[in-house]
Amino acid sequence: MTKSRVLLANVHIMMAYAFRSLERIDDAPRSTAEFEHLHDLLAEIIVSETSRQVKRGLDHGYREETRELQTVRGRIDLQGSIRQRSFVRGELVCRYDEFVADTDMNRAVRATVLLLARHGNVAPQRREALARLLPFFAGVRAVNPQAIRWKDLQLNRINASYRWLLAACELTVKGLLPT
């Protein structure tokens, strides 16, 4: 396949029209880049959108945890404490909500970044850029890209900035994985 030069602004503007977010047209990069394969173009979009999202802050959510603790945190699970005999060790079983970055959207982004970095036809510099993004997803557990339910990822006004990123991720996963 031959290399083709693509004006990134054109791709950015087409995405802005496709997602009805015309306010993003002004953010379009003014450079051109060479892409040998479609994976290269998608990797560039994912790198720029993920970097943008990391700067804004990753989406966080609450996950319920149950642990034996020496101090009270959240609600005391009296039945669990009796069952595990925590009182003998001077501990209590507590149920509490933990504010974590391990959300469905972050799992989808992490899975896509890993998929592109490992299996995509991506230029070495973009592969390195993808690898540099992974430490930001250290607290996010890995999932199988085929198991991602794209329709179940709910966007609201708080996480609406994920819209472009998730669309690029879905395109990448559906294009890279055999059906």
Segment roles from a protein language model:
Residues 1-178:
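Terminal, charged accessory segments of proteins
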